[in-house]
């Protein structure tokens, strides 16, 4: 796979930061060039998707940030090899031989949960820390777990870890209770190499989802309905 991560939409180009006021003194002509990096929120699920297909994947225009570096460490814990050179991130996922994403890494970035679906689909098992550790009550990832369970994954929570063993994912029809970018990406990746056809309703339609779908299709996936609230994914 050799893909370029797109720039974030104008309304997502900067992260909100607390400030009292931003004062701009206008009246001067502007000229020159500025380089806009790729969108972090698009890059992270694409990095996770490399787990689905053993081989060398080259991702271009990847922002070199703490989050992308942390996510690369998660992939390396699983057995992948990751290198950064400028905005090029190269991931060799052929050596993935572990299914455990440890708490010390996952706790620093919730997006680490993205490895759960690909691991279940490719390896038939996973042991991924809950982003918040062993917490009681509703969890931010409950929608992820509900969707994966609908695909046949028997998941348990053990000592703060999501654990799946001897998993064989199968296509299903699933409707999200609420729109979730993270859960949509999770089930898209899992369904890509699951057995049969998966239909997802009330999915997120953010640019991050479109980018992920386009990248997966470029790699041989069969995903229909990008830009709409229904995705049809034929397992390959």
Regions picked out by a protein language model, each given a short descriptive name:
Residues 1-236:
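Structural preference for solvent-exposed beta-strand-turn elements
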């Amino acid at each position: 796979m050799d893909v370029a991560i797109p720039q974030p939409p104008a309304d997502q180009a900067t992260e909100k930061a607390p400030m009292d006021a931003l004062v701009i003194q206008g009246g001067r002509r502007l000229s020159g060039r500025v380089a806009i990096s790729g969108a972090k929120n698009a890059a992270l699920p694409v990095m996770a998707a490399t787990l689905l297909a053993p081989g060398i994947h080259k991702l271009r225009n990847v922002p070199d940030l703490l989050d992308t570096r942390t996510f690369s460490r998660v992939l390396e814990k699983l057995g992948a090899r990751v290198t950064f050179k400028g905005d090029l991130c190269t991931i060799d996922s052929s050596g993935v031989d572990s299914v455990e994403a440890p708490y010390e890494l996952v706790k620093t970035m919730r997006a680490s949960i993205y490895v759960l679906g690909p691991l279940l689909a490719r390896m038939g098992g996973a042991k991924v820390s809950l982003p918040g550790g062993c917490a009681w009550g509703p969890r931010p990832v409950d929608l992820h777990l509900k969707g994966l369970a609908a695909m046949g994954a028997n998941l348990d929570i053990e000592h703060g870890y999501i654990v799946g063993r001897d998993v064989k994912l199968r296509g299903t029809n699933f409707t999200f209770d609420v729109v979730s970018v993270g859960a949509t990406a999770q089930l898209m990746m899992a369904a890509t190499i699951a057995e049969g056809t998966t239909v997802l309703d009330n999915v997120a339609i953010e640019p991050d989802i479109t980018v992920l779908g386009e990248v997966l299709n470029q790699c041989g996936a069969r995903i229909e309905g990008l830009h709409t609230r229904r995705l049809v994914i034929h397992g390959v």
